[in-house]
A protein has these predicted regions:
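Amphipathic alpha-helical polymerization modules
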Residues: 1-238
Length: 238
């Protein structure tokens, strides 16, 4: 009985984590650059034959697939080509050398003249930040060129991500163990951004399915407990 309860509990815990992830997807369906994450499962079997197999969550993975695009008309909004990510500075000595990557292309210039994306300083293809004068007029070219008053001062830093990728918030990504970021020149579309890569409808369908699996695991736990209680009662009678 104990094995059955353990296996069922592992399944319920895994589905609970999945539901939390789906809820995050649902909340960020319209968040530019958001990337969904999913628990990674392994199959758990009780030693006793005849018991069902249940999944157990052992980690999480990031879904890098491209989301739907939305037209904004803002000339500083950029949509990198599929599979490309903008480079931004997170700190001077943090994880991955203080560099993270995002598809949140809502570029803006703060009060100090720093070009930012996802709230972080944007990096050029040379790994430098972009600092603008108060009267500078910035435009973005189709290949990511940074044009100030018509003169190119650099190019948006873009990379492709491979291997294990971890999230730092809704839209910031860094290579995990065995992962890497490779510099990659690419085109950008201006006046548009990418939304979350799981639609609200997809998330609601996923939630219904995960909830059913969670309920099934909880019912199995209840059934095993009742069987254990009955066995104890029979032992007392004898």
């Amino acid at each position: 009985m104990a094995d059955g309860i353990y296996v069922s509990m592992a399944g319920a815990t895994a589905r609970e984590r999945q539901l939390e992830s789906i809820a995050d997807d649902l909340a960020n369906a319209q968040t530019p650059g958001f990337k969904s994450s999913r628990p990674v499962f392994k199959t758990v079997l009780a030693e006793q034959s005849g018991l069902r197999a249940f999944p157990a969550a052992v980690g999480s993975g990031t879904d890098l697939r491209t989301g739907a695009s939305a037209h904004t008309g803002n000339p500083l909004d950029v949509l990198p080509e599929d599979g490309h990510f903008l480079a931004v500075r997170t700190s001077n000595n943090g994880v991955n050398g203080g560099v993270a990557y995002t598809r949140d292309g809502r570029l803006s210039v703060d009060a100090q003249g720093t070009l930012r994306a996802a709230g972080r300083p944007v990096l050029t293809s040379d790994g430098q930040g972009v600092q603008l004068a108060p009267d500078a007029k910035l435009a973005i070219g189709g290949n990511g060129e940074l044009l100030v008053n018509g003169t190119q001062i650099g190019r948006l830093g873009q990379v492709k991500l491979e291997g294990m990728i971890t999230k730092q918030g809704p839209s910031l990504l860094v290579p995990g163990q065995g992962g890497k970021a490779t510099e990659a020149a690419g085109r950008v579309q201006t006046g548009a951004v990418e939304l979350g890569n799981r639609t609200a409808l997809d998330s609601m369908v996923d939630m219904v399915s995960a909830q059913r699996h969670f309920d099934a695991s909880m019912q199995a736990i209840d059934a095993y407990r009742k069987m254990g209680d009955r066995s104890s009662e029979l032992g007392k009678v004898r």
